[in-house]
A protein has these predicted regions:
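FIC/Doc superfamily catalytic core
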Residues: 1-264
Length: 264
């Protein structure tokens, strides 16, 4: 597809159903599905332990997902914001409190939230509600770039996301492509979800909060497909602990994305 002479990004996940997936990925998803079944039994046997794990993971998730973006405060304040709904005292805490509420929204109501534009915009509005910048729940109005900093501290452009003008159409096409793919019984959801989230990050639809939204949406889609380990072991903390590898994987997976030639 072309527009104004430029190649337009399209979204098609049918390659996940072509039978050519690496054996290690197929085996990994099978192992995860088996562990999910075992965890379901254990949750019924050890209710108190899982309740305590959920409380700890919630604090770790909110702390880590924000820390990845350089948004930090003291551990004491994190605990107060998460466990006592303490009002934010500064901009960083406003960002953290917004993530708390967005994560709570997913934990408590994921069955009623979907990967559709209205719900994505609503989650972003919740995420940004305390910042006072007026951009919550709205797609970007100016083009943005993804920067990286080299060992000498020099900034350079790593990636040019979708333009602001093309973002609404790209998000519509992304959500429709996901809905189409999830209805295909031959497409493994554990492989579909990271592909969709990568595309979301490459669109970079918001002026701020794209990274944190990607992690919230990852949890949402995993929960909706019955994979709720992120409630008990912080998914965001794992990314923060290995963020060098995480960002390198994003870089490799997005090479030639704008040409529809990335390999995921």
């Amino acid at each position: 597809m072309q527009k104004g002479g430029a190649v337009m990004r399209y979204f098609d996940y049918s390659f996940l159903n072509n039978g050519l997936l690496p054996a290690n990925l197929v085996n990994l998803t099978a192992n995860i599905a088996e562990l999910k079944t075992m965890a379901g039994v254990r949750k019924e046997e050890y209710i108190q332990i899982f309740t305590e794990l959920e409380a700890v993971a919630k604090v770790q998730s909110i702390k880590s997902s924000n820390a990845i973006e350089g948004i930090v405060t003291s551990d004491e304040r994190i605990a107060e914001i998460v466990n006592q709904n303490s009002a934010p005292l500064n901009h960083n805490e406003a960002e953290i409190a917004g993530y708390r509420d967005a994560l709570n929204e997913i934990h408590l109501g994921y069955e009623h939230i979907d990967f559709r534009e209205a719900d994505i915009l609503r989650l972003h509005e919740i995420l940004m509600q305390f910042t006072g910048n007026g951009i919550g729940g709205q797609y970007k109005t100016d083009d943005n770039v993804i920067l990286e900093i080299d060992a000498e501290g020099r900034r350079k452009v790593r990636f040019h996301p979708t333009s602001a003008l093309e973002t609404p159409e790209a998000m519509e096409q992304l959500t429709l492509a996901y809905m189409d793919a999830r209805s295909d019984a031959n497409i493994n959801q554990l492989l579909l979800i990271p592909c969709v989230i990568l595309d979301f990050l490459c669109i970079h639809p918001f002026r701020d909060g794209n990274g944190r939204m990607s992690r919230l949406l990852s949890l949402l889609l995993l929960y909706k497909n019955g994979f709720d380990a992120g409630k008990y072991v912080s998914f965001e903390e794992q990314i923060n602990n290995y963020k060098v590898y995480y960002y390198e994987s994003l870089r490799k997976s997005s090479i030639d994305w704008e040409k529809n030639e990335n390999s995921y």
